[in-house]
Amino acid sequence: MILSSSLRPTILVVGDLMIDHYIWGECERISPEAPVQVIDVKRETKTLGGACNVMSNLIALEASVLSCGVVGEDLAGRELLGFLQELGMESKGIITQKGRPTTQKSRIIASNQQVVRVDWENKSPISEESEEAMIAYIRSKLSLCDAVILSDYGKGVLTPRVCQTIIQMAKTLQKRVLVDPKGRDYSKYRGASLLTPNKKEAKEATGIEINDEASLKKALECLKKECELEFSVITLSEDGIGIFDQALERIPTIAQEVYDVTGAGDTVIASLAYGLSLGYPLRECALFANAAAAVVVGKIGSATATHGEIAEYLHSSHQGESQERILSRDSIQKIAKQWRSRGRKIVFTNGCFDILHAGHVQYLQKAKACGDCLIVGLNSDASVRRLKGELRPINSQEDRALVLSGLEAVDYVVVFDEETPYELIRAIEPDVLVKGGDYEGKEVVGSDLVKEVKLIEFLEGRSTSAVVKKIQGS
């Protein structure tokens, strides 16, 4: 799982800035004037919406955020700037355009259900003067950013000129541009790093009805090719997230209760940008974004998800205990760096763990007690065969990794193919290296790379070889 990092990526968010206005009340009667509900208002609230909600999500993830967009000379515009100031954000990139209203969406909520929405907005393209001012600001800030998000709600801010200018400038500086798109014509996004349309939006853009894995792959490939993307992503609501890098993968949804899907797309693109800016692979970023979205849809209104909420949600829903803990070498190296930055003690051990038994479990429990985070290096199938012979392993590396990742003592599992874990230890840089008591008086591989080596006695009479012999004997 992507952890809170001492490294704070700087992300520029450009798009349609909005105010989300909520009127909360109760409904107990029908109007005598017309067959409509009467809402007894109890309170009202205003929050940041649209591209501003993307910013709020990034701030909740502890990223540094720069903003760029257009507001009107009105109360909603002044309120929006005030909300951003409360979040500690500067507003130099926000342009005020005379005669143009600030977008505000008013929602009436009764008994935790949305009854109706009223919109104040102007969807026409912004003026050339506003375009020029936005581009000038972005040009001055882009070199300071790790990534750019274009949050398009179709309100006229992200014109073809603005989009293409940003994408070309970002390419020159080797910065990623992530787009939450709107409309049928995606040509203005061509050359971006990735798009995050939902299933309906993807169908409108590609003409492909997504109803199975084959059509999902076709739509993702179409978007990647036609828009010249680095990756393609489609959000699938209750079916999770579909991603395509070199191959298709669908990340299943983990939402338990859905109260309001408002702003879930904002959470997804913010989480993807955050993870990619820290150097995580797309798959892990999608897993993280999926979990963040699950937190958000369990709240009313445009909401955000913190690292703590995401971790708690994954733990309570028993998700990520397997797929989130089995990592590549590159990913575990980044995660180990994050643990160290938080002052945590990293423990490493390794082995084949072919047929898991009580001796293994006790050994791993004692290893975990040596620090805060236990990383297990698991010999690949090829590595086990070289060590144990052609009849081993009994269980595949995928099965062995999954079983290990389900143990409470194990934080992460990473498979290695070499005969020894030396290079893996070098990459992780653990504080403590743990081996079995049978290494007493022997050289421990990787001992020169760590501060401390701990030898732990195995539970007597328990071994995989003994289990295999017992099975063969029966």
From Swiss-Prot:
Protein residues bound to ATP: N198, K199, K200, E201
Active site: D266
GO molecular function: ATP binding; heptose 7-phosphate kinase activity; heptose-1-phosphate adenylyltransferase activity; phosphotransferase activity, alcohol group as acceptor
CC per GO annotation: cytosol
EC number: 2.7.1.167, 2.7.7.70
A Pfam family that the UniProt record links to this protein: PfkB
HAMAP family attached to this UniProt entry: HldE
Keyword hit for Phosphoprotein: no
Physiological role: Catalyzes the ADP transfer from ATP to D-glycero-beta-D-manno-heptose 1-phosphate, yielding ADP-D-glycero-beta-D-manno-heptose.
Protein name per the record: Bifunctional protein HldE
